[in-house]
C-alpha cells in the first residue's frame, strides 16, 4: 500500500512525488562511476550534490530537463558549449561563482583529474533532455544503447 501525504492542493499524490532523498547514486558504470549524486526533491524542485570524478560524455552535447544554477564548492571544470557552427568552446568554471543555465542550453563538462564538487539548484522539469547527434536529439536510453557508455576507469 502506497503512503499518501496530504497537503493543500496535493491531496492523493503519492509521498514519493512530493519528497525524495537519494544518497550517493553512482552514475555511469557502477564499478567506475563518472559521478556520485546525492538528491533532495521537494515539490518538484531539486537540490543536488555532485562529486565529479570524470568528464561528461564528450562525443555529443546534451541539454537538461530543467533550468539550473550550478555552484562549484570544490575544484573547477570546463563547461563546453557549441559555437554557432557546433564547434566546442571551453569556459572555465571556478569555485563559488554561480552559473545559471537554461534547460535547452547544449553543453558537456570537462572535469580535471582532481575532480570537482558541485551543488545544483534545479527548477521543476519542463523539457525532455537528450544528446544531440548530428543536430538531432536522442533520448538517453536510445543514445547509450547505440553508442555505449565510454566513462571507463581510464576515461578522464
Locations of regions flagged by a protein language model:
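Conserved short histidine dyad/triad with adjacent acidic residue
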Residues: 46-64, 103
